[in-house]
Amino acid sequence: ALAGTIIAGASLTFKILDEV
Protein backbone atom coordinates (compact mmCIF):
# COMPACT_ATOMS: atom_id res chain seq x y z
CA ALA A 1 0.00 0.00 0.00
CA LEU A 2 2.82 2.36 0.88
CA ALA A 3 4.59 1.68 -2.39
CA GLY A 4 1.41 2.53 -4.28
CA THR A 5 1.15 5.83 -2.46
CA ILE A 6 4.74 6.71 -3.30
CA ILE A 7 4.22 5.82 -6.96
CA ALA A 8 1.01 7.87 -7.09
CA GLY A 9 2.77 10.82 -5.45
CA ALA A 10 5.73 10.61 -7.83
CA SER A 11 3.38 10.39 -10.80
CA LEU A 12 1.44 13.42 -9.57
CA THR A 13 4.65 15.40 -9.03
CA PHE A 14 5.90 14.46 -12.49
CA LYS A 15 2.60 15.59 -13.99
CA ILE A 16 2.84 18.95 -12.21
CA LEU A 17 6.47 19.43 -13.32
CA ASP A 18 5.53 18.52 -16.88
CA GLU A 19 2.72 21.07 -16.77
CA VAL A 20 5.03 23.91 -15.78
Swiss-Prot record:
Its main location: secreted. GO terms for cellular component: extracellular region; membrane; nematocyst; other organism cell membrane. The keyword Ion transport applies. The keyword Nucleotidyltransferase does not apply. Residues 9-20 are annotated as: N-terminal region. Residues 1-10 are annotated as: Plays an important role in the hemolytic activity. Disulfide bonds: none annotated. Signal peptide: none annotated. Keywords: Cytolysis, Ion transport, Membrane, Nematocyst, Secreted, Target cell membrane, Target membrane, Toxin, Transmembrane, Transport. Composed of a long N-terminal alpha-helix and a core region rich in beta-sheet structures. Before the pore formation, the alpha-helix binds the lipid membrane, partitions into the lipid-water interface and stabilizes the monomeric molecule on the membrane. Finally, it traverses the bilayer, thus forming the transmembrane pore. Pore-forming protein that forms cations-selective hydrophilic pores of around 1 nm and causes cytolysis. Pore formation is a multi-step process that involves specific recognition of membrane sphingomyelin (but neither cholesterol nor phosphatidylcholine) using aromatic rich region and adjacent phosphocholine (POC) binding site, firm binding to the membrane (mainly driven by hydrophobic interactions) accompanied by the transfer of the N-terminal region to the lipid-water interface and finally pore formation after oligomerization of monomers. Hemolytic activity is 3.6 x 10(4) HU/mg. Octamer or nonamer in membranes. Monomer in the soluble state. Belongs to the actinoporin family. Sea anemone subfamily. This is Magnificalysin I. It comes from Heteractis magnifica (Magnificent sea anemone).
